[in-house]
Amino acid sequence: MSASPNSLIRIGRGEHTFEWLENWAVIPDTPEGRADGRTHGVVVTDDGRVIVFHLANPAILVFDAQGALTDAWGDRFPGAHGLTLVKEGSTEYLWLTDYKTGEVVKTTLQGETALSLPFPDLKGYDDPKYAPTWVTVFEERFGGNGDIWVADGYGAGYVHRYDKAGKYLSSMDGTAGAGRFRHPHGVYVDSRKTDPELYIADRMNRRIQVYDLDGKFKRLVSDAVDTSACAFIPHGDFTLIPEAPYRARLTILDPDDRVVATLGENDQVCTRAGFPNDRALVEPGRFVTPHSVATDEAGNIYIVEWITGGRITKLVPVK
C-alpha cells in the first residue's frame, strides 16, 4: 500500500493496482444508521447506478456514479443481507434476502415485487429457523434455464434450488461433497465456463466448495485455503471474493481458481478488540469486514462492509 503524489492511497500490484477512494458514498446520517447501518450488499446497474442493501430503513440506497444518494426504498427488511442483480431481456431485477424474516424476493429496481420464493419444502426446519443469506441464478442471458439457488447461511446450513417460476426443487447440505456446510454464506453460478459450476462459500468451514449444476461435488478451491469467503462476482476473466470475518481482504482468483492478488489485506484486525463493528478499527487502504462487491463497465470495484455505520469504498484501476 502506498500514497500516490496526489495523496490518494494505492493498493495492489501490477495489473491489479487500484486507487482507494474512502467514503466514496455514505449512508444517510440517521439514528438507526448510526446504531447499525451495516452495509451488506452492493450491485451496479447497466446505467452505472450503485445500489446498496443495508441494515436501516429504507434498506435500499441508490447512488449515482459520483456517489450522491438519488433514491431509497424498502422498509420491510430488518435482516437486509444478500443483494444480486439479474437481467431478463432488457430488464434488470434485484434478488434480496432477509435473514430475520426468511424473505427471498425478486424486485424491480424501483422495489416492486416480481417474485417471492416459498419456504423450502424440507422437514425439520423449525429449529434452526430459515435464515437465507444469498441468491444466485443460472441466467438465461448466459445460456441458463433461470434456476435459482438460495444459501441458508444463518439457518440450517442448506443450499436450496428453485426453478425460474419459484417452484422448490431440491436441497443440498454438503454431505455429498467435502462435508456438511457450516454457514454456506454466498453462492455463485459461474456461467463463463463450458460446463457452468456452482461455487459455495462454506464460510465457517473456511473453504469454498464447487459443484456442477446437478449437485455433484467437483472440488475444493485448493488455492483458497483457510478462506473466509462471503460472496463471489465475475470481473472479466477473474473472480472477486470479499473475505470476512476470519480474514479481512478482497481476493482475486484467475480462471483456474488460483489466487493472483489480495487487496486491502488486514487480517490482524480480526483479533483486535471491538472487531467487527467498532468504527475505530477503520483505516483507509485496509478492510475490516468486506462483505459484498460489485464492478462497473470501467473496471471500478465497489466494496461494502458490515461495520456499524456502514462503509462503501470504491477502487479505481490504475492504468
Language-model regions, residue ranges each:
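Eukaryotic scaffold repeat domains enriched in small/polar residues
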Residues: 1-319
